[in-house]
Amino acid sequence: MPRRRVIGQRKILPDPKFGSELLAKFVNILMVDGKKSTAESIVYSALETLAQRSGKSELEALEVALENVRPTVEVKSRRVGGSTYQVPVEVRPVRRNALAMRWIVEAARKRGDKSMALRLANELSDAAENKGTAVKKREDVHRMAEANKAFAHYRW
């Protein structure tokens, strides 16, 4: 670990269409091989489809979907005296968003729809309705934390 100073987190530029930092982060997570314009067109197309389905604005629809996928607790491995325990810890707000977006993108990539924009739109609408693979992932993480509640005193 460096001993000098802690490097601050980089500021992310808000996306050009909606001016949202959250959406810019979502585009960056979806981006593959530095193709940002492709990622932007996929996200904007998916949000447009989602907004038409839900009757809300694009950003509101995205926020609802993310809210249903954000984890509140997760487990971290902690080695104590030769055995490893899965210790439940609370998730920081920045990490909550990052995990939710990552899980939605992963779930969308695994879907079998035609285009990525359609897959993403379907996964986001499923997440908004509290169903789908990304929501299931959050439930699994919460269940794991609940099962290991007995080891919570090992928190650091």
From Swiss-Prot:
Swiss-Prot/TrEMBL keywords: Ribonucleoprotein, Ribosomal protein, RNA-binding, rRNA-binding, tRNA-binding
A single GO cellular-component term on record: small ribosomal subunit
A biological-process GO annotation: translation
Keyword Kinase listed: no
Keyword Ribosomal protein: yes
GO molecular function, one term: rRNA binding
Family per record: Belongs to the universal ribosomal protein uS7 family.
Quaternary structure, from the entry: Part of the 30S ribosomal subunit. Contacts proteins S9 and S11.
Listed name of the protein: Small ribosomal subunit protein uS7
Organism: Shigella dysenteriae serotype 1 (strain Sd197)
Classification of source organism: Bacteria, Pseudomonadati, Pseudomonadota, Gammaproteobacteria, Enterobacterales
